């Protein structure tokens, strides 16, 4: 019976892969995954290198069940860390579904929906046979909280009996091990509500897996749940990609910029740890006769999507200058990657952008100063000690070596140091999460005090960049102290919120945010913009904390003086913060 299922499964994979103009490669870990699913495992850890086809492996069993009209799962919920990854995965899954409708008999009525935290003028529930969403939306709405921004509601019934894919989980890692301390108990609650969960990444830390297993070992309700571990074994699965040569270089990437650009094969990817240094590099290179592209998280949505689309279309590009946003979701084969040093799991993801289909070379510039204020010092010191060029070269195609490198850095001592400053915060959140299934409707007061940190140790705020005419109207409407409404044709308002938004992650420590401050009557204030059927509404806040506490869904207005462009090319919100003495 299983052998018959294998043949049918591979026909789905073949159809999807060939539609993407790729060659079919029958990896053994696909079959191992399908087998543990068929055995009824509730939780599966899947680790395989980037570019090995993990997405096709997890999609196939669900799509096949639709053809047979005997659903194994009520729906499929595909979860990504960021909204840009949600949008990219939505397009990818839609293409896979469409080709399967045409050639394999998937029902035409199949619905694919998504929510990536962006603006949505109509507020439906997060429904669909296949739903792509973010970790934040999944978890906040699962617990009954509406988070900041425009997030669709997810009903508990959507989770029951669904297949939930937790992808690119490594991108949740933060400087305090905060998300990874909470995630095991969130997963436990999803399992208790009848979901099947697949957790997958190229770099899964052993301590995260152990934390999840520990959470499952506690409680009578969880006793019948079973988990499986699937890893791509390099002795069985040789990932088809080019050979990668990694070299550690002394010094700073920014100091060697021209040397790297002029002396290495294109296309070339340059990865910086901060937006400021990425923009500075772009300024230096824009005079060169090279097709250069800048990509980071603080560029308005419409511009960022256009640039990301260049990769999917396969348009020729010489140099891409980017930040951490390229660590996942970019399907482009770079001949050369040059990066600032970053934590070992981050480095493996960065190196994975190179030599995907042909041989390539990667350079890691090892000046630890370039990681300060961005990554934890103890993690960076241990990463530096574990910069093994040969192992890093192999890590992009060998999941076992990637695991060894990651686990050498994220030891118990290192993780305990990361958690030490937020230990009490973690305890407060877990006091709500752990007993959730038994006390679903208790302690609603938790929302006002703690819910904003249910997953991440920061607050994400949505921002909007207004054209000069609307920005002036927004200021004038507040100065008038009357009606704060701005008349605007409906379609233009929808376009504005859809295309001119971006997000900023605010640390919990106090900082100034001049990019969101506006001068009104000799006083600095924050302004938020709200969408209505009749146009726009502007509201004023003396402190950003006031806006956050109200849990409003308005977008904070960006001071246009801080959003930079060069001859119409968006550099983005380069320096939104003022850390002062912090």
Language-model features and meaning:
Residues 138, 150-192:
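SF2 helicase catalytic motif II
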Residues 206-262:
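Interdomain hinge/linker at the junction between the two RecA-like core domains of SF2 helicases
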Residues 72-97, 204-208, 275:
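Conserved Walker A/P-loop ATP-binding site and its immediately adjacent core
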Residues 41-61:
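Walker A/P-loop
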Residues 112-122, 273-276, 292-306, 321-327:
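Conserved helicase motor
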């Amino acid at each position: 019976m299983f052998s018959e299922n294998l043949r049918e499964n591979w026909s789905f994979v073949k159809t999807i892969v060939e539609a993407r103009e790729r060659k079919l490669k029958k990896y053994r870990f696909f079959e191992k995954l399908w087998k543990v699913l068929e055995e009824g495992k509730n939780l599966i850890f899947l680790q395989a290198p980037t570019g090995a086809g993990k997405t096709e492996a997890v999609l196939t069993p669900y799509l096949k069940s639709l053809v047979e009209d005997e659903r194994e799962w009520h729906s499929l919920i595909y979860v990504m860390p960021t909204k840009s990854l949600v949008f990219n995965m939505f397009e990818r899954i839609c293409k896979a579904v469409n080709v399967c409708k045409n050639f394999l008999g998937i029902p035409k009525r199949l619905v694919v929906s998504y929510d990536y935290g962006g603006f949505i003028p109509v507020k439906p529930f997060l429904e669909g046979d296949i739903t792509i969403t973010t970790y934040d939306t999944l978890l906040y709405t699962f617990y009954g909280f509406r988070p900041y921004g425009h997030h669709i509601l997810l009903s508990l019934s959507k989770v029951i009996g669904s297949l939930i894919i937790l992808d690119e989980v490594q991108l949740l890692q933060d400087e305090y091990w905060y998300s990874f301390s909470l995630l095991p108990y969130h997963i436990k609650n999803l399992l208790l509500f009848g979901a099947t969960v697949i957790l997958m990444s190229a770099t899964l830390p052993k301590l995260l897996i152990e934390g999840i297993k520990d959470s499952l070992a506690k409680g009578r309700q969880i006793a019948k749940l079973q988990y499986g571990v699937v890893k791509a074994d390099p002795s069985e699965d040789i990932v088809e990609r080019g050979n990668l040569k990694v070299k550690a270089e002394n010094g700073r990437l920014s100091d060697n910029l021209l040397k790297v650009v002029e002396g290495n094969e294109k296309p070339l990817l340059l990865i910086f740890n901060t937006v400021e240094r990425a923009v500075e590099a772009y300024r230096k290179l824009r005079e060169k006769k090279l097709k250069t592209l800048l990509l980071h998280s603080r560029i308005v949505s419409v511009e960022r999507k256009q640039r990301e689309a260049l990769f999917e279309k396969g348009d020729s590009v010489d140099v891409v200058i980017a930040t951490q946003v390229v660590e996942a979701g970019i399907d482009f084969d770079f001949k050369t990657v040059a990066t600032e040093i970053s934590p070992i799991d981050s480095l493996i993801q960065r190196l994975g952008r190179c030599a995907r289909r042909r041989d390539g070379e990667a350079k890691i510039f090892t000046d630890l100063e370039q990681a300060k204020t961005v990554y934890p010092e103890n993690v960076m010191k241990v990463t530096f000690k574990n910069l093994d060029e040969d192992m890093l070269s192999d890590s992009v195609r060998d999941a076992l070596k990637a695991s060894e490198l990651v686990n050498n850095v994220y030891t118990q001592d290192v993780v305990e140091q990361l958690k030490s400053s937020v230990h009490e915060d973690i305890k407060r959140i877990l006091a709500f999460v752990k007993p959730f299934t038994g006390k679903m409707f208790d302690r609603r007061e938790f929302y006002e005090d703690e819910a904003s940190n249910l997953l991440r140790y920061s607050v994400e705020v949505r921002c909007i960049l207004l054209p000069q005419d609307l920005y002036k109207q927004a200021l004038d409407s507040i100065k008038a102290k009357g009606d704060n409404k701005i008349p605007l044709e409906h379609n233009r308002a929808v376009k504005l919120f859809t295309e001119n938004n971006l997000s900023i992650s605010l640390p919990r420590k106090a900082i100034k945010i001049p990019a969101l401050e506006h001068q009104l009557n000799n006083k600095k204030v924050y302004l938020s913009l709200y969408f209505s059927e009749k146009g726009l509404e502007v509201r004023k806040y003396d402190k950003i904390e006031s806006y956050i506490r109200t849990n409003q869904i308005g977008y904070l207005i960006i001071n246009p003086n801080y959003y930079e462009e060069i001859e119409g090319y968006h550099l983005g919100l380069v320096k939104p913060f003022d850390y002062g003495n912090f």
